Amino acid sequence: MLRSTLSNWREYLTPVTHQSTFENTGQITPEEFIKAGDYLCHMFPTWRWNQQQGGMVYRDFLPQDRQFLVTRKVPSNMRAADSVNVGGEEETSAGEYWVLQPQQESADGGEEIDIDEMLQEMDIEDQSGEQDIIQLRPSHTRFYDLYITYSTSYRVPKMYLVGFNNDGTPLTPQQMFQDIAPDYRTKTATIEKLPFFKSAVVAVSIHPCRHANVMRVLMEKVRAAKQKPVEEEQPDGPREDWEDLQDEVDSSLRVDQYLVVFLKFITSVTPGIEHDYTMEGW
């Protein structure tokens, strides 16, 4: 918790800057954070801004209804260690401390539902003359409330995770760490209290120290790809994730698209949590 306390003091003492350096550094201003948050909420309605209410700690450089973004009850059906190298695909490095993991298909991604597998999750007892009794086996599914706020010390978004068992009981920090990729549990994950609530809500935060560098590297790759002649034939072979992103933007990454890309990288740290990160919002 000492690291968390020092981080909070650094956030408090660091002055806020309003000069945009997005294209050169990958950092954003509070105004750009708001613009990116509005875009995220518009394209992905599961995300929304906070509501003004009692019991909150407000930061004066952000509007009271734009303090943080939240999405609730995001499912996690497998632990992080179980989802590493799914399908034997090779990991792609994207800067120090960041790895792009293979993406899981969403429920509406065209994958067929295995009815037999669903039935195996249930024990059905048929008792004649009595109502059928369906007993559900314990589920390994967990749910997360995800929060995104603005880090003044790193000038990038910062993610907080608050987890629950399938019966609604809160997860312990140790349990939440099971949903952090093993390589990052000691590098980027920290136990903290949510800074925007007066009451103590224990969360796991994803440290933002590398966020700006990852975004900057991504933007450089997009720019380099755009400078190549359009008619140049693409080489055969596997494509990197950043190349897929490059195909979906017009000329370069816009600042309002920042959080969509941010969530795509967060999946490297929390591969088992089913973020609403698809690129349909581009």
From Swiss-Prot:
GO process terms (BP): autophagosome assembly; autophagy of mitochondrion; cytoplasm to vacuole targeting by the Cvt pathway; glycophagy; nucleophagy; piecemeal microautophagy of the nucleus; protein targeting to membrane
Cellular component GO terms, alphabetical: cytosol; mitochondrion; phagophore; phagophore assembly site
Bias kind Basic and acidic residues: ranges: 225-240
Alphabetical list of InterPro entries matching this protein: Atg3/Atg10 (IPR007135)
Pfam families: Autophagy_act_C (PF03987)
Location(s) in or outside the cell: Cytoplasm
Active site feature: 209
Principal subcellular localization: cytoplasm
The keyword Cytoplasm is annotated on this UniProt entry: yes
Region (Flexible region): 83-138
Keywords (A to Z) from UniProt: Autophagy, Cytoplasm, Protein transport, Transport, Ubl conjugation pathway
GO molecular function, one term: Atg8-family ligase activity
Handle region as annotated region, ranges: 213-257
Origin superkingdom: Eukaryota
Region (Disordered): 225-245
Domain remark from Swiss-Prot or TrEMBL: The N-terminal region is involved in phosphatidylethanolamine-binding and is required for ATG8-PE conjugation. The flexible region (FR) is required for ATG7-binding.
Membership in a protein family: Belongs to the ATG3 family.
Subunit details: Monomer. Interacts with ATG8 through an intermediate thioester bond through the C-terminal Gly of ATG8. Also interacts with the 40 amino acid C-terminal region of the E1-like ATG7 enzyme. Also interacts with the ATG12-ATG5 conjugate.
Function: E2 conjugating enzyme required for the cytoplasm to vacuole transport (Cvt) and autophagy. Required for selective autophagic degradation of the nucleus (nucleophagy) as well as for mitophagy which contributes to regulate mitochondrial quantity and quality by eliminating the mitochondria to a basal level to fulfill cellular energy requirements and preventing excess ROS production. Responsible for the E2-like covalent binding of phosphatidylethanolamine to the C-terminal Gly of ATG8.
Record protein name field: Autophagy-related protein 3
